[in-house]
Amino acid sequence: SLIVEPKTVFYNLMNKGKLPLPGEDMETVMFEMLIEHMESKGRMRYEISNFARPDYESIHNLLYWENETYAGIGAGAHGYVSGNRYSNIGPIKRYMEQVGNGIRPIQQSHIVTPVEAMEEEMFLGLRKTDGISTALFHEKFGQSLTSVYGETIQALIDKELIEVNGDRV
């Protein structure tokens, strides 16, 4: 659904009652219609809100949702390398000054803890329609998915919010 941010034209229109937005039930109906239409055109849903022809999915998005390494290069870019999540300085003038002076243009850096990495694996992986591989989780973290999140997973299964399909949650 559309998130209307403060200090935008849409926000101002919404506050004046001049931007009619659908309610949650209508958004659900509209999204289900979208899924049906996209699939009828050969675009399959592979992530919460992304569709593509088979084998044409966004590599960048999938790397991100699979919690894999990616380098952020350029002003304002973000990266995740060797457990370090970072963002570069922006705008480009400041970025180029840093690089020109031989200084790494890192604005923020955070070493992701093992617990944070597991949490990220879950919330990022659950964005994909194929979910999270229990085998890959064990391979990455040396713990089974159920030993870490078993109670939560079962509660979500009981509420019919997620399902287990073979190796995947």
Regions found by a protein language model. Give the residues of each.
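Short amphipathic alpha-helical interaction segments
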Residues: 142-158
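C-terminal scaffold of the Radical SAM
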Residues: 1-143
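Short, Lys/Arg-rich nucleic-acid/phosphate-binding segment
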Residues: 51, 166-169
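A short, conserved structural fragment
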Residues: 157-167
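Extended hydrophobic-aromatic, low-complexity segments
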Residues: 134-135, 147, 164
